[in-house]
Amino acid sequence: ILQSGQKLVLEITTRITTSRDIDPLIGSNEISDTYDELFAKSSLAWASRWNESDIEIDGAPDDQSAVRYNIFQLITSCSARDSSVSIGARGLTHTRYKGCYFWDTDLFMLSFFLYTHPEAAKSLMEYRVRTLPQAKENAKKMNNAGARYPWMTSFDGSEQCESWDIGASELHITADIPFAMQQYFDATGDENFHLQAMEAVSYTHLRAHE
């Protein structure tokens, strides 16, 4: 029973996970750190990422803030150790496009991770390798040879574009992906991944030269 003038502080810790990662009921019992301990670990992790990723510019403070805001969005939107997903078109800030993945990741976002967090870049490319079977199936539906990566995909690699004409017309993604894979190899020299990616490159090459 609290006496007059006494204070009671309640500390509530939550954990966000999915059934793909761990049994939620088991995971909820693994939170043993206090808020201060979790905050200290998070601060160290973020300090390390900023040390690797920060970009300083000569310009107005608002411009510097904008650069860092975008870096923050890239880091938080990429699940660096989970190749079953990629980066949603609007990151974690918006529900537009239902969190689906586009070619923007392969051409525009990959470069950032190549030179700041190669492990994350590899994860993004492994997502494309993993979803090659769906790209082959998509090519069959379009009466094409080889593989044709869908315009708008979710975690299972299938076409999610609701507008048939856009999904059917946007062909360049099939060339964008092997280009991105080559960019990754050039930056890292990762021979093991290069061998994994060869099938994807070969099948998209068939589509390009049909």
Model-found features: residue ranges?
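Aromatic- and histidine-enriched alpha-helix N-cap/loop-to-helix transition segments
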Residues: 65, 99-106, 116, 169-176, ...
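Helix-terminus loop motifs that line ligand-binding clefts
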Residues: 78-93, 119-179, 185, 192-195
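Aromatic/hydrophobic pocket-lining residues that form the small-molecule binding cavity
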Residues: 121, 201-202
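Acidic/polar, glycine-enriched structural segments that form the non-catalytic walls/loops
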Residues: 1-96
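Alpha-helical support elements that line or immediately flank enzyme active sites
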Residues: 69-74, 105-119, 131, 175, ...
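Residue-level preference for non-acidic, small/hydrophobic
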Residues: 5, 108, 202-204
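Short, charged/polar micro-motifs that form catalytic or ligand-binding hotspots
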Residues: 60, 98-99, 111-115, 164-168, ...
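Conserved small/polar residues in nucleotide/adenosyl-binding loops
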Residues: 204-210
